[in-house]
């Protein structure tokens, strides 16, 4: 999850039927892999951040639980209830969209409004508990993006859906999420194109500037040499 998850489809003709089918299949495989669980270690005063690429208008749910290292037992034990976790989420424009204090185990939810890289940061409030300061925490984190964030068992019970109706709803939401992912990939391609054009333009202007500088230096050297020869009465 800390690493960027991206999909680039190359070597296919955009207008061909085979190309469209392969694109959809690859998107389905990539979409099925979205979300995942991991654990990491942090000091109780340390801050750990992750980058998650998220399309716009997409729900994200994160579940976490913390364990505190017991030096006597030399193993991780469930953290005390007083030890909380502060969660902060920033959008690609560095605006804070979630900043909240949770307990030692909890769940946070947010919806993206801008496509791009979202920063998810966690750190404990252990500075309030000098007894635990300097200890080591193990944080188990599970982040689900888009359709994977939905609890379909709860939805089926709440809306009284049959198995077929629930399956249809899942497929509809998967298609909607795939469309969001496709739009996001197109947005990334457009951004990359703009960056490439801007870079090429800067390289061109820099080359022109270098040429003008070389011409100016050459003219100055010629005039300087001419003045030198005239002063020496060599010409």
UniProtKB/Swiss-Prot annotation:
Signal peptide: 1-37
Cytoplasmic side of membrane: 223-235
Bilayer disposition of the protein: Single-pass type I membrane protein
Subcellular location: Endoplasmic reticulum membrane; Golgi apparatus, cis-Golgi network membrane; Endoplasmic reticulum-Golgi intermediate compartment membrane; Golgi apparatus, trans-Golgi network membrane
Ranges that cross the membrane: 202-222
Assembly and oligomerization: Monomer and homodimer in endoplasmic reticulum. Predominantly monomeric and to lesser extent homodimeric in endoplasmic reticulum-Golgi intermediate compartment and cis-Golgi network. Probably oligomerizes with other members of the EMP24/GP25L family such as TMED2, TMED7 and TMED10. Interacts with TMED5. Interacts (via C-terminus) with COPG1; the interaction involves dimeric TMED9. Interacts with PTPN2 and SPAST. Interacts with STX17; the interaction is direct.
Annotated protein name in UniProt: Transmembrane emp24 domain-containing protein 9
Gene: TMED9
